[in-house]
Amino acid sequence: MQAWQQQLNLFFIAMGFFTRIPMPKWIEVDADKLNKASRYFGLVGLLVGAISALVYTLMLYWVSPSIAIVLAMITSVLVTGGFHEDGLADTADGLGGGWTVEAKLNIMKDSRLGSYGALALVLALLLKWQLLTELALFDPSSVSLALIVGHCLSRVVAASFIFSEPYVSDSDTSKSKPLAQEQGINELSILLATGILALLLVGVMQALVLTLALTIVRYGFVRLFTKQIGGYTGDTLGAAQQGSELTCYLLLLVLGVSW
């Protein structure tokens, strides 16, 4: 397999893991390739954001921006299978309902939705819709750019945990365990480069503020997860992604998408 085919193979692995988009049949998957595929998590975010933005833009011809935003949000959930939203809900249930590390991890593995998870999920979706709707009041076209940037940067933040933080879940059924064993400097470099590419889509001031704010948000999540469970799980990565995405939308609303 040539170098470009190897990279394409890794991208399709990342896409197949984090979305419901079918992978080509020729894709080769093993533990090492799953680890290396983390370099393209941000690029998958760009793809998901672009699909959502396309739906939003097309729907503007027939419906109001607020309805188009709902349809774009539904699209992103359908494309990803609600993968990250599920992680947010499980994390809220685990951290909110467990008293010990073992109890918190066991609750996260439970497929049932608890009160903490339901609250976190509903509030996150409502806040996401409200932030994007407010952004559309200033400039409806800016929502498309916000979706692309938010989906990309939030996945860059979440995926960077794999490089620096310990994986604590020992469940053989964990959805992210094959990807969580290690992340090399090459993977991290490509991941961060994707984030820089997304930052080029907004103004200089916005890019600087987003970088600083997401660094702080990441630090906060690291401290929280380390204190609560001693590291991260696949579910907490989903929570970090959702929190980072909301942070992007909030800052783009405050600052505007260009300067």
Swiss-Prot record:
Pathway: Cofactor biosynthesis; adenosylcobalamin biosynthesis; adenosylcobalamin from cob(II)yrinate a,c-diamide: step 7/7. Keywords: Cell inner membrane, Cell membrane, Cobalamin biosynthesis, Magnesium, Membrane, Transferase, Transmembrane, Transmembrane helix. Its EC number is 2.7.8.26. It is an enzyme of class 2 (transferase). Its main location: membrane. The chain crosses the membrane at residues 9-29, 43-63, 64-84, 118-138, 143-163, 190-210. GO terms for biological process: cobalamin biosynthetic process. Pfam families: CobS. It catalyses: alpha-ribazole + adenosylcob(III)inamide-GDP = adenosylcob(III)alamin + GMP + H(+); alpha-ribazole 5'-phosphate + adenosylcob(III)inamide-GDP = adenosylcob(III)alamin 5'-phosphate + GMP + H(+). It is a multi-pass membrane protein. InterPro entries: CobS. The keyword Membrane applies. One of its GO terms (cellular component) is plasma membrane. One of its GO terms (molecular function) is cobalamin 5'-phosphate synthase activity. Its cofactor is Mg(2+). It comes from the Bacteria. It is found in: Cell inner membrane. NCBIfam families: cobS, PRK00235.1-3. Belongs to the CobS family. Joins adenosylcobinamide-GDP and alpha-ribazole to generate adenosylcobalamin (Ado-cobalamin). Also synthesizes adenosylcobalamin 5'-phosphate from adenosylcobinamide-GDP and alpha-ribazole 5'-phosphate. This is Adenosylcobinamide-GDP ribazoletransferase. It comes from Shewanella pealeana (strain ATCC 700345 / ANG-SQ1).
